[in-house]
């Protein structure tokens, strides 16, 4: 059963940049471990934290989901690609992922081509999430294009409206 909670979707706060990057990396790592067991992380925890701070938070358009001051989700976009959409374990099923996706699509410039996302083929929850929100499968990969070497599924959608 999906329960809606009061979620605040926002941008990164410059004055809290380092702390937010660290909290987001903690949430991201926990989410990957819990929701994608068996998918290896090719980086150490320190490397992942540096990537969140130095790449995701500085080069991508980022939105954070917050409940009562706690970061419970993150989404980032680089051009047409939705690069990350993670919800903290224990917070899935509350509409947070949908709200983050909606914010990312609304944030995309009107001239941005069709939004795209790639998921690991074994991540049935992510595939179902995007398919239920209007994304359609347009291709697969054998894993040679990602650091995890996991087969993937690529999706795109023709509209930015998310129900």
Located regions from the model:
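A short beta-loop-alpha structural element at the N-terminal edge
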Residues: 6-26
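A short helix-loop-beta-strand connector motif used in the catalytic cores of GNAT acetyltransferases and
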Residues: 53-64, 81
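Conserved GNAT acetyl-CoA-binding A-motif
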Residues: 108-121
